[in-house]
Amino acid sequence: MKNSYFLLFLSLLIMVGCSDKVLRIACVGDSITEGYGLAVQSKTSYPIMLDSILGPKYAVLNSGRSATTLQKKGDFPYWICKEFSNVFVYKPNIIIIKLGTNDTKPNNWHADKYEQDYQAMIDTFKTISSKPEIYVCLPVPVFKTKWGINDSTVVHGIIPIIEKLAKKNKLSVIDLHKGMSNEGVNFFDSIHPNEKAVKMMAAIIAEKISKK
């Protein structure tokens, strides 16, 4: 699996070098982005589906890492992962941030730190030489509390902060919480989407990007 992701990353870099007309998209996120639980992550994750929907004018990098938090002092910060570093190497034109689900765990959740670190991530990505356009995703619903992950914190904590920062930084919001609210049957463990739900997520994101 690791080799397949490395080859995909390498092929995307080669594609970038071959054509300046291809818009590069980096999908930043946790296990929902990486494709946890899907039969073949490297072929059915939402970034792969997004790449298929958008077509040859776009090249999409899956930069998701399972179990990660946006908060720097969470139990597994995205900041320390190679996937975070890969975003800078890739020099994307567009970055899609979908982080927050694991931050809702009681041992992780600190509203002030989440807001502070989310702003820091936005500011850090803005330093990339390609000057990427940043989209922020409202997390998909948590249909049943599990591992401490809960929808109450998503609704009352995560979403208001993301909306506040989007307004402050003039960023586009992709509402996956509302968009996937009726799809509980397609979240196999109440948190992670199956192949059908992944395709729906990709379609929602593609529609938002295509309108620009």
What are these regions (language model features)?
Residues 1-3, 10-23:
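Bacterial Sec-dependent signal peptides at the C-terminal "C-region" and cleavage site
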Residues 84, 118-123, 159:
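Generic structural signal for well-ordered alpha-helices
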Residues 22-27, 32-116, 153:
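Conserved SGNH/GDSL esterase-like catalytic core that processes O-acyl groups on lipids
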Residues 38, 140-212:
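Catalytic His-Asp segment of secreted/periplasmic serine-dependent ester chemistry enzymes
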Residues 98, 137-138:
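Alpha/beta-hydrolase-fold catalytic nucleophile elbow
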Residues 59-61, 133, 170-172:
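Conserved beta-strand segments of alpha/beta enzyme cores
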Residues 126-133:
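A short helix->loop->beta-strand "cap" motif at the edges of active sites that frequently abuts
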